[in-house]
Structure formats: C-alpha cells, structure tokens
C-alpha cells in the first residue's frame, strides 16, 4: 500500500470513528477541548483568531468562539477559493451562507477581509490525532 493509500485508509477510519461518537460524548469532548484551548497562553495573548465552522463531526469550537468574543477578540473564518487560496473573513451577523458541501461560510461581500499577517492564532480542523 502506498503512503497516499495508507493516509486515505486512516482518514476514512478517523471520520467513521468520529461520526460514531454518542452526542453526549461529542459534546463533552468539545467542551473539554474548548476549555483547554481557552487556557493556552497563545489564546489569551491573541487578538485576532482564525477559527473554522465545524462540519461533519469536526471538533466544534463554537464555545471557544463565544469565549473569544467575550474577551473582545476578532474572529475570522476561512473562505476557500480557486487554486487552494484561502481568505480570512470576519463576517457580520447576517454574513453567512452554506458554502461547498453545505459548510457554513462567511459571505465575502459582507465581511471584513484580513491579511494573513493580521492573524495571531489559527485553528484548523483535522480528521484524527493522538
């Protein structure tokens, strides 16, 4: 099996395991993760944070986003474009739409766009980790 094939098998297994979690287990894990991330010095020091809108069983950082907003931090979310480009967008209250695959995505025309150097901390989703 090639490395690419091994990665695909691991990815599929990770997604399957993640989706099999009971709702209460998932909620407890999300709460614990958000609390742990909020306690990190890099989170406390960051003024502008790039988060993601959870999709398909990804770790849900909504509680972390609420904490960050309460601390006056600026929250940006990624918008994927052509050729794997990524835009950091700060959406307004009515600045969301269902993007590719139904993923909650900021509407660029209603968002403040931030340059990469404005981001102090970036959270990205992953399939699985140990």
What are these regions (language model features)?
Residues 2-118:
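N-terminal active-site beta-alpha-beta segment that forms phosphate/nucleotide-binding
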Residues 122-130:
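Conserved Motif II region of HX4D acyltransferases
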């Amino acid at each position: 099996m090639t490395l690419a094939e091994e990665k695909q098998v691991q990815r599929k297994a990770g997604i399957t395991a993640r989706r099999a979690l009971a709702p209460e287990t998932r909620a407890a894990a999300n709460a614990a993760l958000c609390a742990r991330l909020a306690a990190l010095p890099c989170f406390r020091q960051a003024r502008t944070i790039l988060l993601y809108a959870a999709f398909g069983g990804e770790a849900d950082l909504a509680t972390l986003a609420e904490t960050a907003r309460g601390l006056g931090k600026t929250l940006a979310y990624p918008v994927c474009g052509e050729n794997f480009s990524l835009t950091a967008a700060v959406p307004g209250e009515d600045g969301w739409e269902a993007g590719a695959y139904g993923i909650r995505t900021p509407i660029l025309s209603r968002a403040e766009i931030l340059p990469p150097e404005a981001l102090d901390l970036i959270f990205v989703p992953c399939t699985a980790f140990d």
